[in-house]
Amino acid sequence: EVLIHSLDKADQDFSRELLADVTPEQLYESALTVMMRLVFLFCAEERELIPSKPFPVYEQNYSVCTISRQLRELADQHGEELLERRYDAWQRLLAAFRAVYGGLQHNDIHIPAYGGSLFNPDRFPFLEGRKAGTTWRLEKASPLPVNNRTVLHLLEALQLLQIKVPGGGPAEARRVSFRALDIEQIGHVYEGMLDHTAKRATEPYLGLAGTRDKEPEIKLADLEKQQSRGDAEFLKYLKEETGKSESALKKLLKLEIEGLEASRFRTAANSDESLWKRIRPLAGLVRLDNFGYPVVIPQGSVFVTSGTDRRSSGTHYTPRSLTEPIVQYTLEPLVYVGPAEGLPKSDWKLKSAKELLALKICDMACGSGAFLVQATRYMAERLLEAWELARQANP
């Protein structure tokens, strides 16, 4: 959401010329791809799969962990607002993505070319300021103006997990360990992102404050229509949409928005005084974004909202607690002599490594591959066991 808002704001500042040929769906898919690239890099760096130690050039210039740490140090020393005036972090991220895709061969750094569609720079060339159909090896990049504050929030959205404190109170930020992250948990991250999509507002919307699972974006005209039905009906409607109590909603509706807060509303409304006048009676209901600005979505803006991609694509990642027993009981008769014959488990005999390697396992509806991942784990363990038994039999 932070990245899409930043890209849309940059597009607006350039008279909608930067993303003229990019649909909201493509914009959301590109943001989703950026987030999954970052997850991949965090995992690879924390597990030391990218050779940063023998090549300090990577750690100093390309590492997403380093970029995050440097930005946080600057924000703590000088305030996050300073980061809004700098744009180098986004260019460093794009360079890291290119390095993973195309590789780096130099005296001071060596990274093999991993390729793959996830990191392909030509998949979303507009992120680099290039036109569709151009190639990254020939066309000069002119990266979109994504400021360092946006990049910091992108990185920390993945690195920090908000944990509820027992007994109430504000949530505490806990750092995620990507070293210990299972592939299934990465699947859950992807699955959660598919719960949303991007749309272009055909009229003004407001993002309302609500409970954790209820922070809707609603057309301003619909809110005005509901408000015209009377206080009781309006409160009932807001309670259903936001999950907040009627007493809390009454307090929010009575809030007077003045001074700096009013100025920020005007900024969010693109200095449209007529729009601000319509928003003002409802301003207390509006939530703030990551930068402290009210979520006002003027006509023509792209915004993130609940989507149906996850449901329509059938993307529901199966947890390991289910894949482990299902894979075990499915494959045991294939890797052991005994289960199919009805022998007790104590009499089962593991087949030879040659027989195990000859097995072909297929999941016809593999989806995100949770069962195949677990099948690979299970077969790898049995194969190691078979090799060890063969070694013991023929020392």
Cite the ranges covered by each PLM segment:
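Cysteine-dependent PTP/DSP-like catalytic domain, specifically the C-terminal lobe
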Residues: 385-395
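Preference for the N-terminal adenyl/adenosyl cofactor-binding alpha/beta module
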Residues: 1-381, 392
